[in-house]
């Protein structure tokens, strides 16, 4: 749930989940217009169903990616740490740092940039102190979170997302997955958010799956 709320799942604020998570308290989500429907029950532990590895999909817009390239960057000790520090010193938290052999991308929330001059100042510092070969900035990005504890036991979850993006002619800007394998993050252009969200729901939650999950919820 924490991963979903991070990427725009609007029912809860991230901070609202902490006390119930710490005290192992189940949470019920219901439709205010149809409260008689069972809705969704959130618990700390549940029996995993390998047929439905994905628990939820959410998205959030308002991200900017700064891509920094330099030949032999991977051999330069402290390059990534210093790049992040320059943003932190300017009051801009770095959300994600996907990297390649000769490049890194710093993903930030666009709202944390006060003005074009603010960002230009940070980039000028990076250019002066780290001497990269190039710096590129891409705005108006969207991050998708695909979450599910059973994902680690299933092959093809990431492939289904990539196939969905490809079928809708959507270019993936970033992919990130932690070692726990309970969540994956994909970054795309914000203009493709709606069609991507519809495609991912169709890929992970076909009608028969929704019917089965609803029946299980009614039986609890």
Tell what function each PLM region has.
Residues 1-220:
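C-terminal catalytic "cap/lid" subdomain
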């Amino acid at each position: 749930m924490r991963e979903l709320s991070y990427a725009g799942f609007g029912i809860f604020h991230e901070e609202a989940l902490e006390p119930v998570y710490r005290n192992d308290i189940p949470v019920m989500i219901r439709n205010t217009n149809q409260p008689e429907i069972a809705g969704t029950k959130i618990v700390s532990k549940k029996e995993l169903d390998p047929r439905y590895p994905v628990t939820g999909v959410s998205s959030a817009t308002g991200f900017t990616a700064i891509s920094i390239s330099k030949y032999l960057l991977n051999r330069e000790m402290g390059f990534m740490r210093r790049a992040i520090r320059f943003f932190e010193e300017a009051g801009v938290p770095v959300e994600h740092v996907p990297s390649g052999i000769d490049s890194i991308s710093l993903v930030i929330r666009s709202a944390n940039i006060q003005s074009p001059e603010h960002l230009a100042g940070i980039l000028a510092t990076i250019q002066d102190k780290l001497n990269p070969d190039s710096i590129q900035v891409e705005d108006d990005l969207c991050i998708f979170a695909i979450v599910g504890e059973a994902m680690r036991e299933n092959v093809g979850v990431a492939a289904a997302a990539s196939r969905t993006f490809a079928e809708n002619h959507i270019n993936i800007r970033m992919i990130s997955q932690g070692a726990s394998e309970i969540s994956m993050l994909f970054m795309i252009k914000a203009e493709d958010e709606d069609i991507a969200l519809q495609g991912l729901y169709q890929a992970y939650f076909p009608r028969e799956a929704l019917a089965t999950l609803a029946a299980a919820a009614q039986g609890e």
